[in-house]
């Protein structure tokens, strides 16, 4: 197409949504003119399934659960008065607790005020809060957030070192729906030890966000933690950012959670519209279907031209890949669905992988995210009549054009500014687009059996480790190769796992395992040196 034809296509396929301060440009996707007409029956079916989900139908059939994250920003939509009341009560409790923390009515044992918080969670229990904190935080935050989002000891040491002597002014929030997530449990125990090492009582500075009567809930109640906030079984981790999971840390940080909820609520209203061409989430889902052939044939690259949206691609990576990446469809037929998602930020990526996007394998489509407002206040001119923000906008348009010249397709989302409201809009937009796409390809977006499989496999490894260490201790001073140990404990098929266990144990002082050099790496002998 020439420039005039592209302009006409842009006019035809630019969606403008003033209610949410957003535009959606599909003009650089090469779908045929009859694409929407062909997909309309499937899209209307997806819209009806979404409406049934919001009415309280069992949308997660595998776990026989309702799916209710949309109720969080409009409790009146909840299917029962009890659920509606619980949502409202929890929001009020978050605000009251936050006010008490900020005012000093609830203070650390040393009598000062809380200046930092340590959020312990993994997956959706960390990615959502991290994204919001990074996107909306400032040097004027009322409380500075830190995160344990893994079970990496060195990573936790680094976070604790950064908190340093301020641990006495640090509120810890432990987030786990089940209350039994090992990574989160480990982080909690590491944090508890750090408090105790400084003569502090962990329970006096701890808050739980968890399911009612979970292991974590019972622990927090028994130990007298400062507060407990609910995670309901109808909220999944990756869609929990507008629940206490995301709202409590954001409120404590000093962010406008009402604005966040309002943006999500308004976007929910716009994305309930039954006319496909007026529904941005429906259009996004249809573009994903077109680009990937409905079977994940292309990757999704997220390119926000805003530093504050750096973590958005990581947040979307979980939201989309954990929701869409499924082995079976809702009929039990093997489908192996999924869309790979990755990204960073522009214009940084122009000096990284955009080279391949333009000239390498064409196995992707890009979503550009443009923010019109550069900053609060005026900018200096870095060239005559040109600001740094003008350069950023120019690089965005240049990259979009350079990719299209090579037949690389893209979607562009434009928002007026970055604010709590627009972050709420973006979160809600993608939540609903994921739900629509899942309906289009007939999968359950709201469970994650693959994650559970990994957890079970890890449990098996740790069980083998226990047997290996027990045998080495029993035969103290005697060396064994991995194969010899596998035979000794009756686990001949686990020699590789045992070898890796031994390498890790020998590299750390915790289990008193020592490695002797062998003729080859597999002839190494390991023994208990305690």
From Swiss-Prot:
This is Glucose-6-phosphate isomerase. Catalyzes the reversible isomerization of glucose-6-phosphate to fructose-6-phosphate. PANTHER family: GLUCOSE-6-PHOSPHATE ISOMERASE. Its EC number is 5.3.1.9. Pathway: Carbohydrate biosynthesis; gluconeogenesis; Carbohydrate degradation; glycolysis; D-glyceraldehyde 3-phosphate and glycerone phosphate from D-glucose: step 2/4. PROSITE patterns: P_GLUCOSE_ISOMERASE_2, P_GLUCOSE_ISOMERASE_3. Keywords: Cytoplasm, Gluconeogenesis, Glycolysis, Isomerase. InterPro entries: G6P_Isomerase, Phosphoglucose_isomerase_CS, SIS_dom_sf, SIS_PGI_1, SIS_PGI_2. It is found in: Cytoplasm. GO terms for cellular component: cytosol. It is an enzyme of class 5 (isomerase). GO terms for biological process: gluconeogenesis; glucose 6-phosphate metabolic process; glycolytic process. It catalyses: alpha-D-glucose 6-phosphate = beta-D-fructose 6-phosphate. GO terms for molecular function: carbohydrate derivative binding; glucose-6-phosphate isomerase activity; monosaccharide binding. The active site is at residues 322, 351, 455. Belongs to the GPI family.
